Regions:
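Loop/turn elements at helix/coil->beta-strand transitions in domains of secreted/extracellular proteins
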Residues: 3-8, 33-38, 106-112, 156-162, ...
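His/Asp/Glu-rich, glycine-adjacent segments
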Residues: 61-189
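N-terminal module-boundary/linker segments of secreted carbohydrate-active enzymes
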Residues: 2-21, 25
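Short, structured active-site-proximal loop/turn typified by the sulfatase FGly-forming signature C/S-X-P-X-R
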Residues: 18-65
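Metal-dependent active-site segment of extracytoplasmic phospho-/sulfohydrolases and closely related
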Residues: 9, 27, 189-206
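Catalytic metal-binding/acid-base residues of hydrolase active sites
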Residues: 15, 167, 200
């Protein structure tokens, strides 16, 4: 198992490129100093949550993986996909390509997902070993606790790939504006939460 790395992929939805310079984000700043950063990024089109998150998971553009918008009509299925429709979100027929958790499982690695787009549906008949149906009422701290519990499992049960999604600061920035005090407070809160996750990861067993 030592040659199989542990990867935790975290998304802060709609975290604007300059939020870390506008607001106090010491955890993200430290991660950037000690890790790798990008100077620019071109999102997939359309710049919506579901198409872009599934593009991250598959490496494919929306016209190749099938999620072309947050809501759309699929003529081949004669169905309307909506992000709030649990039956559609969990219908694997909408999801093309191969998300990274499917690749991981094919390679004998366990995977886990806390709300990543596509994880609620069987893709190629495969889902993460551990996953949660989306529920925005679950506190962010509880999500981190669950991820840390997954990574504390015995080695033969422990996921090597974990995807973790937070719907903020998207919701608050749409409600109050990207430069509002409310968005700033959310950005700083998320940074603190990442600090909790980072500290927890450092304490995990080998």
């Amino acid at each position: 198992e030592r040659d199989k790395p542990y990867v935790v992929l975290v998304s802060l939805d709609a975290f604007r490129w300059d939020y870390d310079s506008i607001h106090s984000t010491p955890v993200l700043d430290d991660i950037a100093r000690k890790g790798v950063t990008a100077t620019r990024l071109i999102p997939s089109f359309p710049t919506k949550t579901f198409p872009n998150h599934y593009t991250i998971a598959t490496g494919l553009y929306p016209d190749h993986h099938g999620l072309v918008n947050n809501s759309f009509y699929a003529p081949d299925l004669d169905l309307v996909y909506r992000i709030g429709d649990r039956a559609m979100v969990s219908n694997g027929a909408f999801y093309g390509g191969e998300p990274v958790w499917v690749t991981a499982r094919k390679q004998g690695m366990k995977s886990a997902s806390f709300y990543w787009v596509g994880s609620e549906a069987p893709v190629q008949g495969i889902q993460p070993d551990y996953w949660k149906p989306y529920d925005e009422e679950v506190p962010f701290g509880d999500r981190i606790d669950t991820v840390l519990k997954w990574l504390s499992l015995p080695k033969n049960q422990r996921p090597h790939l974990v995807t973790l999604y937070f719907e903020e600061p998207d919701a608050v920035s749409h409600g109050y504006g990207p430069l509002s005090p409310e968005t700033g407070a959310m950005v700083m809160s998320l940074d603190s939460l990442l600090g909790v996750l980072r500290t927890g990861l450092a304490k995990l067993p080998d």
